[in-house]
Amino acid sequence: MKHLLITLMVLVLSRTATGQDITFDFVKVPRESGFKMDDYFIWCGSIIKVDTVYHLFASRWKKSGSFPEGYRQNSEIVRATSKSPVGPFRFEEIVIGERDSSFWDSNMAHNPTIHKIGDEYVLFYIGSDFTTYLNNSKNLLRRIGFATAKSIAGPWKRSDEPIIKTESNNPAVLIDGRKIKLVFRDESLRVFLAEADDYKGPYKITNDNLWPECELEDFYIFKKNNQTHIICEDNVGGVCGHERWGVHIFSVDGVSNWKKYDPVVVYNHDIIFEDNTVLHCNRRERPQLLIINGEITHIITAVYDGKDTWCQPVELKHTIKIN
């Protein structure tokens, strides 16, 4: 018995020392939850709590367009609110819509992720103008920029220029001491890591092929136990064996030698409701985390059931304390 206890203690200490103590288990979801709009495709979804209200920033475009490609020309970013982190959320306003064609984001805005940096709210997103195309293709060039506000309700001041000049998507931001770390991917789903002293830039690329083994997208980055973690979509199943499931990778130095976390799967395509019915999502993407007082409390994903799309927050059974 003594030897068994010692062995168990060694295993627990070893697991904690290497940081392998993060598990994403979820509670059942209320039927009346999330953020939906009857006439729009809703995608992405990033939540921040301000006082007693939860503010969700999401992308939308009219259902008269196509899914998913319709966002490339018609997406805009909106804000919705709820007293509950799982919703249902109510539409409040358009935050980032069309503007003068001289700007980098005049045509489209997508992939919002909201953060509080100092005394400002900073909304990172991708955008495109009306005339700049990617490599002579039919697709407009997408680039990362930001908007700032002193109040979560605005007014929002948009950056005059993008912070990443090349094709860039799926921005994920980590405030790491005095540094800002930015994860993004290009059109081929090659993953980049960049760093800056200020969220406005300039950004220096510190890793230009973070996960060369396969294609990843839709990132969220955080730190725990002095290790850097990324939650993302396994686009072709090269990490976990399942196409488009959510997976977890990490790095000790936060720059290189990224590895699979154990457990590697964060979520699959099934959402279980409180009435025990199961939604088998056609697509479940764009994972974002809700962090309150240094603890991960919910995951937010965009879901598609074959007809409608919406943002679906799901509560964790056990919160995850991060640093």
Model regions and ranges:
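Acyl-donor-binding surface of acyltransferase catalytic domains
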Residues: T16
